[in-house]
């Protein structure tokens, strides 16, 4: 079992922490704010625009510079994967104009509650109000 620190409690950090913990690692997520996922509330005007339902190939047409840089990321965990994961957390989704994907409830707070429950279920330790001031590489790993 590895000891893993995730710095930043946005949606990406929350999912990274949960996935690492789900693989049997001891995971601590550090978030400087009073709660995780704070910026999720402003996506889609508070409705939580999760992703776009268009084919992955089509997404590259909308990336103005160096789309090849994102190939491995977008093919490694696709928009369909994120939709399936969120639905597995009990959040029903809908696709609107422009292939934009939202929770049926139109509330970002529902997605945030599900993400927090997902992390908790995987055993992630969350430290709020915890700003990481420095990071130092040592032989055994890192010191935060």
Question: Each predicted region: which residue ranges?
Answer:
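Short linear motifs in intrinsically disordered
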Residues: 29-32, 134-136
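Hydrophobic aliphatic residue packing
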Residues: 4-7, 27, 111, 123-124, ...
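Short glycine-/acidic-enriched loop or helix-start segments at secondary-structure transitions
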Residues: 16-17, 39, 137
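Conserved N-terminal/central alpha/beta ligand/cofactor-binding core
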Residues: 32-125, 130
């Amino acid at each position: 079992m590895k000891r893993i620190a995730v710095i930043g409690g946005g949606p990406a950090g929350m999912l990274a922490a949960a996935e690492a913990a789900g693989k049997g690692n001891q995971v601590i997520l550090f978030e400087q704010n009073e709660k995780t996922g704070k910026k999720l509330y402003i996506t889609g005007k508070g409705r939580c625009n999760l992703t776009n339902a268009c084919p992955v190939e089509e997404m590259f047409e909308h990336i103005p510079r160096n789309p090849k840089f994102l190939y491995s990321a977008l093919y490694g965990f696709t928009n369909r994967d994120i939709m399936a994961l969120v639905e597995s957390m009990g959040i029903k989704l809908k696709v609107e104009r422009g292939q934009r994907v939202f929770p049926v409830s139109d509330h970002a707070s529902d997605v945030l509650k599900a993400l927090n429950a997902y992390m908790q279920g995987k055993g992630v330790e969350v430290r709020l109000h915890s700003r990481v001031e420095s990071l130092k590489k040592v032989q055994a790993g890192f010191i935060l």
